[in-house]
């Protein structure tokens, strides 16, 4: 008989002799306590008492009574209140794994929810909410200094979620801090409660994980307080509400200063753009002052677009079709080169393309791909055939052209690189893939595929339908990546930053660009597994934040969402605009719950310029300025808060270009994005050969397959050349 039935029939047992035990007991024996064997941890205890025989009866005494009652607490709290947490976990795992049917596991959770001690209403505050749960979950954590043990209270407005909380409280309430911190989220996977094979399974698994992460974060804080360790300084952040923004810290104040630009400057720029028929395409990473003005000017002149590098050229073509005679590119040089080449291909050679500086606007990543070392890497690694070079879009046309003549090449973005590589492996047997130039992204791709090799075929198929564990394991030794190329911005997310995020922001939403170092990548991937993170492009990051905000608004409860921004701080302008629009719309339409969104800048201690201000009397005052003091300004441990190259795209330069057109073209010759006059080693035009890998990518994005032309290039003999024009 299972424990659930025993609980239901306890009243019956109390009224009748127990059929499970012999009645031949010693008269007047003291009461005995028995525990019925059961996998159900809330115990059913039975007390048997023997009574003297009835003197009026002629029959042998058989009047023992056996009373059973359900005990509404966990066995670990009854007999071994301080049993090791790992031992409790094994008991809990055994219990749930013994339940074959998913519905039985749900019923068990529902029963556990009835055992969870009630939480006082005063603890159900927004500060005690557990982030990342689809239902409301509250957690209160305290520390018993005398016993050196943690105390946990939890509650939820969902009965199933209360069951999850009850299990975790039973494991960790009364545990030492070390025991709490030693438990890993993957340790909970064996409980198999998430294996319901139905809607909501992932969110159920996320509940285990997110409640545990919050328990651990608050445990660390209490232990640090007890040991007298000063709390680490919080990262700067911006809090966005329907009423506006609130910067936290000097760095955030510097960012926020430009989000609400002077209206006269906005009007002046918009009027110039309209008068001169100038379109503007700008990258997310440019200077926040310029972004603020451009974002406001979009309302007055529609031909302004801020995006990642891939979309910039497409928007430039759209602007040319709409009648723009000039395009101003706010980005690094390879972006303006790409815009120039794509406009030419689209039939708009007469449209002028202008950079924002008369000096070179470089890029550490593009420079790495233009080095002799990169071409040597391609020559060495491509000795095996068939081979394909997958090159990051953030490289020059020259790099794409020279590479394509060495190895068949397709470009990629951080949002489509995984699908591009997996599709290539699926379509071309025994393919060798050479990725470059970003070392961090290459390492992260390899790590992702390694993780996939341990997934189930069903999980792998959800990522790419043509792969399984066997195919993923077989492709790992055939994936290669360049070892000496990094973006100086994403290099900042190194050990120091990751340690602080893990310590103080473990329960926040984590966003990371695919180019960040491995530690930050792993941290964000772990968060992604429990629905609390995203790894991808700038557009992926923006979409993730908007989706989480929309979900929160739909829940219609007061909530504070915290996002760690694991990419260049210039993204904040687009984020504030998008989030502010969502919050403002909800506030005006419903007047319901208040949702606030905090964007955290994980700034390395070496990533800011500190300058004294004012007179010598103000020596103790320090201003924190986004960016670096000079040059690239990056330490060995990562120190760029923002891209120094992107910051060359100043508002004054943009105004100068606009004011000089059309009659001052001669003065702007150094600003113009020129066409390539050089040819490839095979004598072809750089623009023609360099654009072909981009066109291959566009075909892949449209069809989800490699173009037939590229497959033919991969399979053809190596000495026949690579481009279609060869």
Swiss-Prot record:
The pathway this protein participates in, as annotated, is: Alkaloid biosynthesis; nicotine biosynthesis; Cofactor biosynthesis; NAD(+) biosynthesis; quinolinate from iminoaspartate: step 1/1
* Residues annotated for iminosuccinate binding in this entry: 283, 309, 392-394, 414, 513-515, 538
GO CC terms for this protein? chloroplast
What are the protein's GO molecular function terms?
4 iron, 4 sulfur cluster binding; metal ion binding; quinolinate synthetase A activity
Q: Which residues of this protein are catalytic?
A: 133 (cysteine persulfide intermediate)
UniProt feature coiled coil, ranges:
none
Major place of localization?
A: plastid
Function according to Swiss-Prot or TrEMBL? Involved in the biosynthesis of pyridine alkaloid natural products, leading mainly to the production of anabasine, anatabine, nicotine and nornicotine, effective deterrents against herbivores with antiparasitic and pesticide properties (neurotoxins); nornicotine serves as the precursor in the synthesis of the carcinogen compound N'-nitrosonornicotine (NNN). Catalyzes the condensation of iminoaspartate with dihydroxyacetone phosphate to form quinolinate.
Q: Which family does it belong to?
A: Belongs to the quinolinate synthase family. Type 1 subfamily.
Q: What is this protein called?
A: Quinolinate synthase, chloroplastic
Q: Which organism is it from?
A: Nicotiana tabacum (Common tobacco)
